[in-house]
């Protein structure tokens, strides 16, 4: 969503965001122009946004997401503090271009979770969820690019489908503030099963249809739910020893790259963040 995470994102950007309903249906598009500049005296980044929802959203709550917005962003190590007035919250950068964030938009009465992933060149994937209390309002998936002409980035029209790929996993240990990277392979066994293996790990995933959603099994020891929103799969799996993993799997705009972002929780405490980049 709207949580830029690194100094490389300074400048002028255009973002095309697809808006999905809680049921997974595509509702419309928001076009966003974003400018980030550094306040020399403080080092704080000033973020200006202009958002234009399309006509398909005129009867949806996201129609209010129109006009000009501002907030300040303060960098502190790998943390990004969103200081208002329009966005308050926190983002964590890791794995060379991944950002995981959360916060509130008080003007709308929404809280949010967000993520972004830097792509090769001057581009990024971005997304997240808006909530009112605990009720989801919209799921956003976007593509951003530096402003170079009058064209807008093309939103992905892909539908999530598993593919085998090679890649790299980077895990950030939050207690130590240390990252560890290793090669990883994703092997698709069939339309609902895949395995990921690399240095010291092997994780087997199975999706079982459950209405319009899925029950997800991980290593036959954790079970959870998963749902598709266009090119993205959201999932959460719970083990029997206080372990919880929350993840997204998302296709890159060119279909040749896949990305995963995982949050690993133990006994209610967020212990690590994991970013995975796969090349098909």
Model-derived segments and their meaning:
Residues 3, 7-9, 14-280:
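Soluble ligand-binding/transfer domains with enclosed cavities or grooves
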